[in-house]
Amino acid sequence: MDLDQWISKVKDGQHLLEDELQLLCEYVKEILIEESNVQPVNSPVTVCGDIHGQFHDLMKLFQTGGHVPETNYIFMGDFVDRGYNSLEVFTILLLLKARYPANITLLRGNHESRQLTQVYGFYDECQRKYGNANAWRYCTDVFDYLTLSAIIDGTVLCVHGGLSPDIRTIDQIRVIERNCEIPHEGPFCDLMWSDPEDIETWAVSPRGAGWLFGSRVTSEFNHINNLDLVCRAHQLVQEGLKYMFQDKGLVTVWSAPNYCYRCGNVASILSFNENMEREVKFFTETEENNQMRGPRTGVPYFL
């Protein structure tokens, strides 16, 4: 495995051969299996939200925040689906994980699932680019090994979706059995699917999975676990980054600019320096993103 050569190859827009991808997936699984459900990460580190197959915009993210290993990263899931280059996105992230395991942490998102990827594009993309479903199988097997959360310097919890009524302490995340498809309900499901809302406690989620959780729930969770902040992704934010609640105890980070090649949103990444001081870096879509606009995304003039 010549990882540096493979990284150059994928950055140049080429695909790994099917057996190279298989080798890479097997190699990264061995790294991921050692990680905790709450993976400890030291500052300085930069936290990123959803990427959703927007490969050229991911390259711009690295230009904006710095390249691995000079910059350490946590990616909070949803690498695949919706965008046209999920395969390239997931491949480059796996390569960086293989090459610099201590400098990049990959969390699972609700789209790192066999079920969702068969509906929202990743399965079809693999089928189209490799002529069969093997690449999809290798990648979705890796999904089951991805960790559920990361904790920066013991004070900032990063998770894809949000909180769960079944999780009061971080220790309850540590004991979840994660090596499986995302369940339809329960604590694992909630970490992937829940959203913050301007309410006090809990409400049913319109997504049909996870919960809506409010300000009191969030501040109690932070207090019990000695956290300053919960970082999460999972929801499009037009302005790229959004703090929630009066105490700003939660932040949503969104890292896919002009999402789905038509939403017109800005993207952001959130950096923590060695003193845990925060800096937000914003970026907009690439020229390649702008050219992706197919006829199906055009807004009819009579709307």
Swiss-Prot record:
CDD domains: MPP_PP2A_PP4_PP6. InterPro entries: Calcineurin-like_PHP_ApaH (IPR004843), Metallo-depent_PP-like (IPR029052), PPA2-like (IPR047129), Ser/Thr-sp_prot-phosphatase (IPR006186). Gene3D superfamilies: 3.60.21.10. Keywords: Cytoplasm, Hydrolase, Manganese, Metal-binding, Protein phosphatase, Zinc. The active site is at 111 (proton donor). Its cofactor is Zn(2+). It is found in: Cytoplasm. Binds 2 zinc ions per subunit. It catalyses: O-phospho-L-seryl-[protein] + H2O = L-seryl-[protein] + phosphate; O-phospho-L-threonyl-[protein] + H2O = L-threonyl-[protein] + phosphate. Pfam families: Metallophos (PF00149). Its EC number is 3.1.3.16. Zn(2+) 2 binds at residues 78, 110, 160, 234. One of its GO terms (molecular function) is protein serine/threonine phosphatase activity. One of its GO terms (biological process) is negative regulation of flower development. One of its GO terms (cellular component) is cytoplasm. PROSITE patterns: SER_THR_PHOSPHATASE. Mostly expressed in flowers and stems. Interacts with PHYA and PHYB, mostly when they are phosphorylated and in Pfr forms. Catalytic subunit of protein phosphatase 6 (PP6). Dephosphorylates phosphorylated phytochromes, with a preference toward Pfr forms. Plays a major role in the photoperiodic control of flowering time in long days by modulating phytochrome signals in flowering time control. PANTHER family: SERINE/THREONINE-PROTEIN PHOSPHATASE PP2A-RELATED. Belongs to the PPP phosphatase family. PP-6 (PP-V) subfamily. This is Phytochrome-associated serine/threonine-protein phosphatase. The lineage of its organism: Eukaryota, Viridiplantae, Streptophyta, Embryophyta, Tracheophyta. The gene is FYPP.
